[in-house]
């Protein structure tokens, strides 16, 4: 069981709502993934109609919604988006995203830390999306973040765990849950992230852009479960030398 703030999750696969070809396909894929937390950008919601085709079905499903501040270019804009989400969605949970560079979507560490402190002081449950920077993740813990979400590789790139060395350090040092976010492109990569000791992974593009998102969602669900089970079972030590599994010379003395 994964616990973030006061909320418990059976599934350690978190998902997103972007890039699906239709709202119905998105909902079916999320159901197939068995995910219990879904992130969505406030800028994508149609708040004027009073009945958004994405929001309403998700609310009715009972899945935990994690509004994100994607599109915010600085701390001020991110705080505004979070406060809007709290008012409209009646939740104090927020995935903090600040990426002023529209080409590579790299998160701004300085603005993110400033916004995180402000939001934590305002009573938000903050899950910041950041570079895989162990020092920054410690600072975010110190200001009160409920979890940290270091990137595996650039958003939507499907490059996998390009930051593995730093993810290991973050996982080792963290006293809050570590959710590996962005860049996970295959179920095997999700398994590996969980084998490292990550508490959860967030996957969107790899599911939504696949030929069969529903089947891919099931694959990721199974992959995350397998990776977590392997981590709990205790992985064997890696050695540069061969280690025999049975005696090599004992039979000569018989």
From Swiss-Prot:
Its EC number is 2.8.1.10. It catalyses: [ThiS sulfur-carrier protein]-C-terminal-Gly-aminoethanethioate + 2-iminoacetate + 1-deoxy-D-xylulose 5-phosphate = [ThiS sulfur-carrier protein]-C-terminal Gly-Gly + 2-[(2R,5Z)-2-carboxy-4-methylthiazol-5(2H)-ylidene]ethyl phosphate + 2 H2O + H(+). GO terms for biological process: thiamine diphosphate biosynthetic process. InterPro entries: Aldolase_TIM, Thiazole_synthase_ThiG, ThiG. It comes from the Bacteria. The active site is at residue 95. Disulfide bonds: none annotated. 1-deoxy-D-xylulose 5-phosphate binds at residues 156, 182-183, 204-205. The keyword Transferase applies. Keywords: Cytoplasm, Schiff base, Thiamine biosynthesis, Transferase. One of its GO terms (molecular function) is thiazole synthase activity. One of its GO terms (cellular component) is cytoplasm. It is an enzyme of class 2 (transferase). It is found in: Cytoplasm. Pathway: Cofactor biosynthesis; thiamine diphosphate biosynthesis. Homotetramer. Forms heterodimers with either ThiH or ThiS. Catalyzes the rearrangement of 1-deoxy-D-xylulose 5-phosphate (DXP) to produce the thiazole phosphate moiety of thiamine. Sulfur is provided by the thiocarboxylate moiety of the carrier protein ThiS. In vitro, sulfur can be provided by H(2)S. Belongs to the ThiG family. This is Thiazole synthase. It comes from Shewanella sediminis (strain HAW-EB3). The lineage of its organism: Bacteria, Pseudomonadati, Pseudomonadota, Gammaproteobacteria, Alteromonadales. The gene is thiG.
